[in-house]
From Swiss-Prot:
Forms a complex composed of PxpA, PxpB and PxpC. SUPFAM superfamilies: Glycoside hydrolase/deacetylase (SSF88713). PANTHER family: 5-OXOPROLINASE SUBUNIT A, UNCHARACTERIZED PROTEIN YBGL-RELATED. The keyword Hydrolase applies. GO terms for molecular function: 5-oxoprolinase (ATP-hydrolyzing) activity; ATP binding. It comes from Halalkalibacterium halodurans (strain ATCC BAA-125 / DSM 18197 / FERM 7344 / JCM 9153 / C-125). It catalyses: 5-oxo-L-proline + ATP + 2 H2O = L-glutamate + ADP + phosphate + H(+). Its EC number is 3.5.2.9. Belongs to the LamB/PxpA family. Gene3D superfamilies: Glycoside hydrolase/deacetylase. Keywords: ATP-binding, Hydrolase, Nucleotide-binding. The lineage of its organism: Bacteria, Bacillati, Bacillota, Bacilli, Bacillales. Catalyzes the cleavage of 5-oxoproline to form L-glutamate coupled to the hydrolysis of ATP to ADP and inorganic phosphate. This is 5-oxoprolinase subunit A. GO terms for biological process: carbohydrate metabolic process.
Amino acid sequence: MQRVDLNSDLGESFGAYTIGQDDRVLEHVTSANIACGYHAGDHNVMARTVKLAADKGMGIGAHPGFPDLLGFGRRNIQTDHKDIYNFIVYQVAALNGFCQLHRVRMQHVKPHGALYNMAAKDRVIAEAIAEAIYDIDPSLILFGLSGSELIKAGKKLGLTVANEVFADRTYQPDGTLTPRSEANALIKESERATEQVIQMVKESKVIAVDGSHIPIEADTICVHGDSPTALSFIERLHAQLQVEGVTVTKVSDFLFK
């Protein structure tokens, strides 16, 4: 039977500000990417979100980003290999501390926002991220855009990698995501988003914005939980995957070295 993971970016509240609906999203996904304080989140939110995810048996992952609270980690920042390596270590280790407190093992690491997108194309950035993860714990699973430089960098080091696809994002002919600055970046119709996911999972391809068919691997599907219709969409997607004979489960249940 075919298996796939559903992941969502969580723990993005900080201080007096509440972002997202983490408690409810955790009812429907199998892996949680938890912000580590640089682009969103803080120490209290990290502690709470790890506990919530641990109590529900989720696969728990660190979601490190650029040090950019004002831009929510979505602004490209030019820096060097060592800086990227160090801020990945800093954030991943911080979240791992909360995992240790709750006696759960961290499952994965997924970079956030601009860092994720830059690592998809830039080999130097991708290698800095992969090296940091490997040096912290080589058993961690690296989430990256399917077929990207980040996936290649992880494989090169011997990390277990999870090819990630997106339910609500459109794709460029080169397999990258359409930038959020473009009008057609997001898929807002739940039926269309569901169809795209089923095609990626069952047929290993996706239709790009120019109509071309791109081969794609789908180990984990990113669903966003911060819109008014997010929960109903995630429920529908989960149900449709089951109808198609796909088991939804965390990646550590089926990806091994």
